[in-house]
C-alpha cells in the first residue's frame, strides 16, 4: 500500500468554499453514445464520481456538487441551473465521444463554448445538444433551437463569453495531463456551441474522454484503471487551475500540486504487467478510496 499523503488543499475552516460542479453527461432514457459493450451515460457517471471523490478527499475547502449521482435524466438547462444556483467557480461536463460506423479514432479532447470552426466540431456539438430532443417541450425551453440545424448555431457567433480565457486555460490544463499523466492521445482543445456551456455563468469545459465507437477505446473506458486514470488527470488539472486562481486573487495559495510533493520510491515489482497492475488498482478501489499514491503506480501502464 502507498503512503498516505496530506490533503492538497487548505483544511482551514475559515477558507471560503471553492465550488465545482461536476456534470455526468446524459443519463436515464438518454444513453448518449452506445458502444458494443457499454453506454456513454455509465462511463460518464463513473468518471464523474471518481473525480468528485478525489476532490472531496484531498480538498477540504472545495465543495463538490453533482448534476446527477445515479442513472437519471437531467435536462440540459437544468444542469446549467444547478451550477448557477450553486454559484459555482467551475463547471466540468464529462462525456464520451463517438464516430459513425466504420470510423475509428483514439484520444481525449476538451471543449469550451464558442463557434464551431469546422464541420467536425459542429457535428460534436450537434450530437451533444441533440439530448434536448428527449424533452417534450424543448422548442419552448430552448427558444426554437434546433440541434440538428447549422443555422441554429449562428447565435454562438455573436456571443461574448467573459469566461472564455479561463475556460480555455482549464481545458489546456486538462489536455496537458491527459497527454503527460494519462498517456492519452491528445486531440486538443476545441470550441463549439454547446447549450449546457452557454447557460453556465462560470468558467466551463466539456471533456470527451475517448471514443466508445472504437473497440479498443471502449474496453479501456470500461476498466477501473482506465476511468481512475482519466479522473486523476482531470483532478490534477483542477488542482493547478485552483492554485493559479488563488495566487491571482490572493497573492498566495495553500493548494499543493502533486508534482511539488517528494517523489516516492516505486515499489512496483519488476516485470509487473499492465493487467496485474490494473487488478491491484481494482482491488484497492473496491475496498478503500484510491489514494494518490495508488494512482502513481498504474498511470504509466494503464493507457492507450
Which role does the model predict for each range below?
Residues 32, 152-253:
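Active-site-adjacent mobile loop/cap segments within catalytic or ligand-binding domains
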Residues 293-300:
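Conserved small/polar residues in nucleotide/adenosyl-binding loops
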Residues 1-7:
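Bacterial N-terminal signal peptides
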Residues 304:
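Cytosolic catalytic cores of cyclic-nucleotide second-messenger enzymes
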Amino acid at each position: 500500500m502507498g503512503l498516505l499523503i496530506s490533503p492538497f488543499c487548505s483544511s482551514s475552516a475559515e477558507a471560503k468554499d471553492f465550488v465545482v460542479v461536476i456534470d455526468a453527461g446524459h443519463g436515464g432514457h438518454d444513453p448518449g453514445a452506445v458502444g458494443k459493450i457499454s453506454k456513454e451515460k455509465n462511463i460518464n457517471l463513473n468518471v464523474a464520481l471518481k473525480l468528485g471523490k478525489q476532490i472531496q478527499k484531498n480538498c477540504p475547502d472545495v465543495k463538490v456538487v453533482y448534476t446527477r449521482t445515479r442513472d437519471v435524466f437531467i435536462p440540459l438547462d437544468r444542469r446549467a441551473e444547478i451550477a448557477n444556483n450553486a454559484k459555482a467557480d467551475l463547471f466540468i461536463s464529462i462525456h464520451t465521444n463517438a464516430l459513425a460506423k466504420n470510423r475509428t479514432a483514439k484520444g481525449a479532447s476538451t471543449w469550451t463554448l464558442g463557434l464551431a470552426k469546422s464541420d467536425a466540431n459542429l457535428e460534436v456539438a450537434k450530437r451533444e445538444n441533440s439530448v434536448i430532443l428527449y424533452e417534450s417541450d424543448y422548442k419552448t425551453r430552448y427558444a426554437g433551437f434546433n440541434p440538428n440545424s447549422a443555422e441554429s448555431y449562428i447565435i454562438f457567433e455573436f456571443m461574448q463569453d467573459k469566461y472564455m480565457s479561463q475556460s480555455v486555460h482549464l481545458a489546456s490544463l486538462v489536455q496537458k495531463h491527459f497527454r503527460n499523466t494519462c498517456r492519452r492521445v491528445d486531440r486538443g482543445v476545441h470550441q463549439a456551441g454547446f447549450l449546457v456551456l452557454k447557460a453556465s455563468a462560470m468558467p466551463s469545459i466539456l471533456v470527451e474522454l475517448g471514443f466508445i465507437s472504437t473497440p479498443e477505446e471502449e474496453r479501456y473506458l470500461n476498466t477501473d484503471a482506465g476511468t481512475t486514470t482519466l479522473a486523476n488527470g482531470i483532478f490534477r488539472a483542477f488542482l493547478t487551475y485552483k492554485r493559479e486562481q488563488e495566487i491571482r486573487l490572493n497573492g498566495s495559495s495553500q493548494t499543493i500540486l502533486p508534482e511539488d510533493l517528494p517523489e516516492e520510491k516505486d515499489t512496483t515489482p519488476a516485470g509487473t504487467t499492465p493487467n496485474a497492475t490494473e487488478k491491484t488498482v481494482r482491488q484497492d478501489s473496491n475496498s478503500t478510496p484510491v489514494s494518490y499514491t495508488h494512482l502513481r503506480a498504474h498511470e504509466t501502464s494503464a493507457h492507450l
